[in-house]
Curated annotation (Swiss-Prot):
Mg(2+) binds at residues 10, 12, 175. It comes from Vibrio cholerae serotype O1 (strain ATCC 39315 / El Tor Inaba N16961). GO terms for cellular component: cytosol. Signal peptide: none annotated. Pathway: Organic acid metabolism; glycolate biosynthesis; glycolate from 2-phosphoglycolate: step 1/1. This is Phosphoglycolate phosphatase. Keywords: Carbohydrate metabolism, Hydrolase, Magnesium, Metal-binding. It catalyses: 2-phosphoglycolate + H2O = glycolate + phosphate. SUPFAM superfamilies: HAD-like. CDD domains: HAD_PGPase (cd16417). Its EC number is 3.1.3.18. It is an enzyme of class 3 (hydrolase). Belongs to the HAD-like hydrolase superfamily. CbbY/CbbZ/Gph/YieH family. Specifically catalyzes the dephosphorylation of 2-phosphoglycolate. Is involved in the dissimilation of the intracellular 2-phosphoglycolate formed during the DNA repair of 3'-phosphoglycolate ends, a major class of DNA lesions induced by oxidative stress.
Amino acid sequence: MKSIKLIAFDLDGTLLDSVPDLAVAADQAARAVGYPAVSEAQVRDYVGNGADVLIARALSQSLTINPELSPELRAQARHLFDEFYEQTGHKLSHLYPNVKTTLLELHQAGFILALVTNKPSKFVPDVLEQHGIAHFFSDVIGGDTFPNKKPDPMALNWLLEKHQLSAEQMLMVGDSKNDILAAKNAGCYSFGLTYGYNHGEPIANAEPDFVSDDIGTLLEVVLVSA
């Protein structure tokens, strides 16, 4: 794929297994507003659409959000979740295998690397610094950087415009349907990872251009013919 100049990465479920910390915070927030406890296994299914949706699903004990949850309750639980998540210090989260070496090789090869996550922006810099990968990214876009999150292509379109590239020069790497749909909506290539968070649905169902269980495979895709 000689055409690729810019590679955009999702964070949670793609580079970082952050569910252990998210689960602690979601459980504490749910119980703090008088709702049942939430397990790590549940949170693995609930992540991928931003913090507001995660908390609403946790309160609903379901992927389908209970329409009877009041906006006030959801806002209160979200505020508590943010506080608890900050207090975790992200100590339980860890990078997936081959992430750091893959980012290093891509960075050294001259690719522009960007981070496009639905995670609230305020948490992202600390997480990247803590895991020693912040310096690889020229752009870091959080879930509240723009009015619309993935699967909307707004962030990807902004990257294309900023770096003066065409859609076929960008590859989006992610673990969920939202990542693949964002890529399709922007007209760029997509690389789906099987190990992340996609609500129990195989990432192949979203029909990415490439599918792998190892982020290191990305090097073969973009460097083999470079």
